[in-house]
Amino acid sequence: MSSTTMESSGLKKSSGLKVVFFGTPEFAAHILEYLIANGENIVAAVTIPDKPQGRGLKLRPSAVKLVALSHNIPVLEPTKLRDSDFIEALAKLDADCFCVVAYRILPRDVYTLPKIGAFNIHASILPKYRGAAPINWAIIRGETESGITTFLLEDKVDTGNVLLKESVPIRPNETAGELHDALMHLGAKLGHETLLGLSLGNLAPKKQLDTAATTAPKIFPADCIIDFSKPAIEVHNFIRGLSPHPGAITTLHNGAKVKLLRS
């Protein structure tokens, strides 16, 4: 990837840690590619099993799996994270650190395996927007900034002690897709900086302020219907917050459903 090569020029030093990378979608795959380009020792990638997609329902690998295989990195695809064979395979890797991006909730038996610990790269400034869809909800709720937080894993989702964070502005007409891409690049940089900091032992984990926490739950089709009775700015934020995926939906007079991506 040319973008990865360009981004890598500012950070050439690797942490020297043995890292297992957990992730699935493009957001995670870009970060994995960046870490590899910066010399990180990714000893394995963990992702979801291949899923049937398209008209022919052919099995398609995840974006993370494709990147890992292109670099000859072993791939683990557990269906159950508490499976004893999977946990044994992870333990044999003798990893220093787990890096988790847009993956499933890891049980304690898994995230406590590495010597240094396991950290997540989350697309919000925690404790705001804990949950599965932080990018969408930040825009829907009219926030003027977002960012990336890296934090140590704990049993409860997105509650662990913060390692690093960096914010970016959200432009008035910016869509979720555009913010996704901006945070994907920032997440790669901050993920690498987190690995460097962990290897040097110079990060000071900071407890999150739970009283300031907000949530960003998963978005379902029923959540995507536009309510035109709301103020224009709220409708505008709703449309761009769901653009391009899953898309804000309205119904025409003839019953046809239409996705609106801009307003």
Task: Identify the residue ranges that each predicted region occupies.
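Internal anion-binding site segments
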Residues: S3, D210-S263
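Conserved beta-strand segments of alpha/beta enzyme cores
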Residues: K18, N41, N72-P74, G117
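Short beta->alpha connector loops
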Residues: T24-F27, T79-R82, A102-I105
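Amphipathic, non-transmembrane alpha-helical secondary structure
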Residues: A29, E33-A37, I87-A91, R108, ...
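Donor/substrate-binding cores of folate-linked one-carbon enzymes
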Residues: N38-N41, I48, C97-T215, A222
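N-terminal glycine-/serine-/threonine-rich beta1-alpha1-beta2 phosphate-ribose binding loop
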Residues: P52-D96
